[in-house]
Amino acid sequence: MTSAKKLFWVAVAATAVLGYIVGVSPAARVQAAAPSTMQTMPLKPPATGPINVAFLISDGADVMDIAGPWEVFSDAMLTSKGKPWHEADGMDDMLMPFRTYTVSDSLKPVKASDGLMIVPNYSFENAPRPQVIVIPAQNGRSDAQKAWLLSNSATDDVTMSVCTGASMLAQYGLLNGLTATTHHMFAAGMQKQYPAVHFVSGIRFVDHGKVATAGGLTSGMDLALHIVDRYYGQDVAQVTANTLEYRGELWKNPKFGEVKPVVAAR
């Protein structure tokens, strides 16, 4: 087991023990009001070319946080008329509307969770301008990273985080005054660390239109499917989910922002 993974589970265990001692679940210490805004307004694809989806990574980046949304955006296909790919008039009529790539401080291999090595496609100096930015849970912070994210998030369509990737958005001020979510085991700690953000747990994602946050790990797939829906409609997103054999439905549930009441531990 890697040291990063050990630290993760130590934190999880400490959170669980504290919740037992005080007699309530950890989630109970996070404000549990439903998000005030949940964006479903359509996004406009570019007139030409693919939609650039940049995955911002550094050491410790969680593999699932990357792989889930990456597969969603990579497997989304449609016809030249914007219809689901199964309605295409042959292979020549099938388009892949999203272009996925990784970006980091340099092209030096990034050591992701559990030791997986990822060679970034681009550095901050030469990365294409993205329409979508995906921020997985990760350890690294740098001035160059902050400058790139603030510059590109100002002009992109949507910046999304997965799991504790929300801490980067919060640290750089992109969540101030907003409702956000993260992995439920870390929501209470992040609420304390970033009081300008209203953290909620027990939901898959929160979308404010320009910035969106997903819960832990697999929640990133739901948010990615939701973004596909915003660009190309629910039919294209549903066919993408079918291609992935993903059975989750919360990405299209109109009550995806509902927070269930927290029950005290017994």
Where are these regions (language model features)?
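Bacterial N-terminal signal peptides that target proteins for export
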Residues: 1-11
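Extended, subdomain-level signal for the structured scaffold at the beginning of enzyme domains
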Residues: 8, 20-159, 167-171, 188-191, ...
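Hydrophobic membrane-insertion alpha-helices, especially the h-region
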Residues: 12-19
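Residues that mark the start of a beta-strand
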Residues: 50-52, 179, 210
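A conserved active-site-flanking secondary-structure segment within enzyme catalytic domains
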Residues: 176-202
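Amphipathic alpha-helical segments enriched in hydrophobic/aromatic residues interleaved with Lys/Arg
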Residues: 202-213
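Active-site-proximal catalytic alpha-helix in oxidoreductases
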Residues: 212-225
